[in-house]
Curated annotation (Swiss-Prot):
Region feature (Disordered): 85-120, 180-220
Organism: Arabidopsis thaliana
PROSITE patterns: AP2_ERF (PS51032)
Function: Component of the cytokinin signaling pathway involved in cotyledons, leaves, and embryos development. Probably acts as a transcriptional activator. Binds to the GCC-box pathogenesis-related promoter element. May be involved in the regulation of gene expression by stress factors and by components of stress signal transduction pathways.
Record flagged with keyword DNA-binding: yes
Protein name listed in UniProt: Ethylene-responsive transcription factor CRF3
Gene Ontology cellular component annotations, sorted alphabetically: cytoplasm; nucleus
Entry's family note: Belongs to the AP2/ERF transcription factor family. ERF subfamily.
SMART domains xrefs: AP2
Superkingdom field: Eukaryota
């Protein structure tokens, strides 16, 4: 028995590689043959290593035995005439975004962007997504703040789409992409209202006596109202203003002359343009009637009566009366004079000493 039996532990690994190949369609395959093929290529390497660390195991007494199996699978499929179906999801999104940018904003605004799924039952709206519990949430991205704005949760997808459309128009203007087109009622409301024609008020005029035609025309121009005023009380005020004015004449008993004319000269007219010195205001002063006889017009003999002692009757000094003739000869007056002379001498002496 010369056979060698290897009792080393065995480690088996398998490496699989898959790829897809596309071929042109043939008449046989179109008639009813299978169009899908799968080719597998297998190879086993008994002395293969998994990593560089396997060489270090040779130093051990019983190193492990490595067996590696390689499997290559090739799937052959017929090619498709429609190129879009063979494009990956990333390329498909890229193509859809580029097509949206090429469209004009006006056409995209009128066309509702409703997306129908493969099943054809659920509609997808822009900015609307469904929650796991069944409600619909709406959100929009603010281009200025560069963040998403939460719009709320709604029962139906249409309600959420309408809220998104309003927010998009508010943030991006009337040319923003919306889910629904603007109804014609709102467009009619946006039209300018018709201008209101204002009626001109009828002015009632009454004939007034005037001295000349030019004065009457000037008064009419002053009291005309503006064409835009339509108030009734304005016309009443105009009628009151246009009534004839009574000329204000001064009463006969009241004079409008200045204060220096009053009582002196009334024949110069009613104007106040004169100066005080223009009128002879001293005429009436000298033409007045002579006054009554005064004391100064009497002769001196009549003024002084027979009693010459009129000033010598009483002299009030300290509450006592005295006779002037007696007092002049009395010694008290002499004593008073001596006291004044002594006072003068003492005052002069004090001034000299100082």
């Amino acid at each position: 028995m010369d056979e060698y039996i290897d009792f080393r532990p065995l480690k088996y690994t398998e490496h699989k590689t898959s790829m897809t190949k596309y071929t042109k369609k043939s008449s046989e395959k179109l008639s009813g043959g299978k169009s899908l093929k799968k080719v597998s290529i297998c190879y086993t390497d008994p002395d293969a290593t998994d990593s560089s660390s396997d060489e270090d195991e040779e130093d051990f007494l019983f190193p492990r035995r490595r067996v590696k199996r390689f499997v290559n699978e090739i799937t052959v499929e017929p090619s498709c005439n429609n190129v879009v179906t063979g494009v990956s999801m990333k390329d498909r999104k890229r193509l859809s975004s580029s097509s949206d940018e090429t469209q004009s904003p006006a056409s995209s605004r009128q066309r509702p962007n409703n997306k129908v799924s493969v099943s054809g039952q659920i509609k997808k709206f822009r900015g609307v997504r469904q929650r796991p519990w069944g409600k619909w949430a709406a959100e929009i991205r603010d281009p200025e703040q560069r963040r998403r704005i939460w719009l709320g949760t709604f029962e139906t997808a249409e309600e959420a789409a309408v809220v998104y459309d309003n927010a998009a128009i508010r943030l991006r203007g009337p040319d923003a992409l919306t889910n629904f087109s603007i109804p014609p009622q709102e467009e009619e409301e946006e039209e300018e209202p018709e201008p209101v024609i204002e009626e001109k008020p009828v002015i009632m005029t009454t004939p007034t006596p005037t001295t000349s035609s030019s004065e009457s025309t000037e008064e009419d121009l002053q009291h005309l109202s503006s064409p835009t005023s339509v108030l009734n009380h304005r016309s009443e005020e105009i009628q009151q203003v246009q009534q004839p004015f009574k000329s204000a004449k001064p009463e006969p008993g009241v004079s409008n002359a200045p204060w220096w004319h009053t009582g002196f000269n009334t024949g110069l007219g009613e104007s106040d343009d004169s100066f005080p010195l223009d009128t002879p205001f001293l005429d009436n002063y000298f033409n007045e009637s002579p006054p009554e006889m005064s004391i100064f017009d009497q002769p001196m003999d009549q003024i002084f009566c027979e009693n010459d002692d009129i000033f010598n009757d009483m002299l009030f000094l300290g509450g006592e009366t005295m006779n002037i003739e007696d007092e002049l000869t009395s010694s008290s007056i002499k004593d008073m004079g001596s006291t004044f002379s002594d006072f003068d001498d003492s005052l002069i002496s004090d001034l000299l000493v100082a």
